[in-house]
Design a protein with these regions (language model features):
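Short glycine/serine/proline-enriched coil/turn segments at secondary-structure junctions
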Residues: 120-122, 139-140, 190-193
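N-terminal Sec-pathway targeting helices
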Residues: 2-20
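Acidic, glycine-rich catalytic/binding loops that coordinate metals and/or anionic ligands
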Residues: 44-46, 138, 142-145, 158-179, ...
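Soluble periplasmic/extracytoplasmic beta-strand elements of cell-envelope proteins
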Residues: 98, 130, 148, 198-203
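Beta-strand/loop nucleic-acid-binding surfaces
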Residues: 146-155
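Surface-exposed, glycine-biased beta-strand/turn segments
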Residues: 30-128, 132-136, 177, 186, ...
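Hydrophobic alpha-helical membrane-insertion segments, chiefly the h-region
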Residues: 19-30
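Active-site loop architecture of trypsin-fold serine endopeptidases
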Residues: 184-198
């Protein structure tokens, strides 16, 4: 199963703005702050895209260890536009990080392994790989976890940007931290409906049988901040102090 999600950002922004402007509560007062936060995140993303150099402190760099004791490396360059738990459409809670490149072109911004582990690319995965990390002592006290990387393909899904040494059907191939996995793309899972160019990165729990859980369910994931050492600054932006 390809664990990717369509992100129609302009549509989400319009819907959120209309709902907030109309004062619709729908499921109660908790919904409005969540939608408002989504609008703010999209506005910040646009600000960063307009002039990334002016917001260098918002930019993260691949291979960086954000704090000296962070167990994982930052997996790519860019701006963390959406974090775990963020919402940019009704009924949605984001399960990981969306890290957007300023490069302006697909197949340009490298994606690397955040930690040593065993890589799998299922036979039908165009843009995704997942890495198993057994006996992860830091943060989770020896549990097995997985890191998931997706959107590494063209908008129409015909060209994969995953590194050629990881063809479809790859299972349990050891990769050290920092290994090149591929490049950021904009495949959403639906041809003709591209995402912005970015990497979706998440830290996924194991199932009872030892496989990876369904990453699209936020309850099956951990906050990447715990592993990367990312923090929110005073403006609410997810930043990596080591970048």
């Amino acid at each position: 199963m390809q664990l990717v999600k369509s992100r129609r950002y302009r549509v989400y922004l319009l819907i959120a703005a209309l709902l907030i402007g109309a004062g619709l509560l729908l499921t109660g007062v908790a919904l409005r702050p969540r939608l408002a936060a989504g609008v703010e995140q999209i506005a910040r993303l646009r600000t960063w895209f307009a002039n990334p150099a002016a917001r260098g402190d918002w930019t993260v760099l691949a291979g960086t260890r954000c704090t000296p004791d962070a167990p994982m490396l930052m997996p790519t360059d860019g701006y963390i536009g959406f974090g775990r738990g963020d919402s940019f459409r009704l009924g949605h809670r984001h399960s990981g990080y969306d890290i957007f490149t300023s490069a302006g072109a697909v197949n340009t911004t490298p994606v690397i392994a955040a930690y040593d582990g065993y890589l799998t690319r299922e036979a039908d995965w165009r843009s995704s790989v997942i890495i198993r990390h057994p006996d992860f002592q830091r943060v989770v006290g020896g549990e097995q976890i997985w890191t998931y990387y997706t959107h590494m393909a063209s908008a129409d899904g015909t060209q994969s940007f995953i590194a050629p040494q990881f063809p479809p059907g790859t299972h349990e191939l050891f990769v050290p931290a920092g290994t090149l996995l591929g490049y950021q793309g904009n495949w959403s899972g639906t041809a003709g409906n591209p995402t912005g160019i970015h990497l979706h990165f998440s830290v996924v729990k194991s199932t009872l049988s030892g496989g990876y859980a369904n990453e699209t369910d936020i309850d099956n994931t951990y906050d990447p901040a715990l592993f990367l050492g990312v923090t929110r600054n005073a403006s609410g932006v997810l930043v990596c102090e080591g970048s």
